[in-house]
């Protein structure tokens, strides 16, 4: 039976591990891109709208960063963002109805037709500029704050490289979380089964280059993830 390796940050990893182990799978939690948070108080002024480009951009913000409570609209790119906003600040976070991507969030903002007013975009260094470009194209009063950066965890990368020599199921919720594997010439991608979050504007790898590519709509549906792994490894 193939091992299952989680290479992304995931708030429900304990529940996933328990469910997989109850089905006799070996589970490994090995992030290969660590998140280094560089700003705990990025909300430095009053903003009518705050846009959160990824969950990592909100996780480490200090809950005493009071300006967030005065925002009229808080937008997030998907369920993980909404979960963290609710957990840390007990506030509502508007997300796309189904397309959890930069493009999907822009379409949601357009559909809502709110007057965004002064807007703050929270993102990571090297992250996509799709939303930033949209704000600029609309001539909206906005600031951009890079809250975190991704740092390669070489020890975990070496561990994963050795572990997947004979194949594995790799769970990754963003392209950035798995890029070190894709660019490693020592890895035979055709032995790897990837389970990824379905983002319409983010193609992680051509399907023909890997053993299989399975897309998730809801990363919090643990039974669905386990069933997909069973289908891959049967």
Locations of regions flagged by a protein language model:
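Signature of uroporphyrinogen-III synthase
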Residues: 1-234
């Amino acid at each position: 039976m193939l091992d299952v390796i989680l290479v992304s940050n995931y708030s429900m990893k304990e529940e996933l591990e328990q469910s997989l182990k109850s089905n006799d799978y070996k589970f490994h939690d090995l992030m290969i891109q660590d998140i280094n948070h560089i700003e705990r108080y990025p909300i430095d002024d009053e903003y009518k709208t705050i846009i959160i480009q990824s969950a990592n951009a909100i996780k480490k913000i200090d809950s005493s960063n009071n300006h967030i409570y005065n925002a009229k609209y808080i937008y997030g790119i998907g369920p993980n963002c909404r979960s963290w906003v609710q957990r840390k600040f007990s506030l509502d976070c508007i997300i796309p109805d189904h397309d959890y991507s930069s493009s999907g969030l822009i379409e949601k903002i357009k559909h809502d037709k709110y007057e965004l007013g002064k807007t703050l975009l929270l993102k990571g260094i090297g992250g996509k500029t799709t939303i930033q470009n949209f704000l600029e194209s609309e001539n909206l009063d906005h600031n951009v704050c890079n809250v975190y950066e991704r740092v390669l965890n070489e020890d975990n990368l070496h561990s994963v490289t050795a572990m997947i020599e004979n194949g594995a199921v790799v769970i990754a919720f963003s392209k950035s979380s798995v890029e070190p594997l894709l660019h490693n010439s020592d890895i035979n991608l055709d032995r790897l089964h990837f389970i990824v979050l379905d983002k319409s504007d983010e193609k992680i790898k051509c399907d023909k280059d890997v053993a299989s590519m399975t897309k998730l709509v809801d990363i919090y549906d643990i039974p669905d993830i386990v069933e997909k792994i069973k289908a891959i490894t049967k």
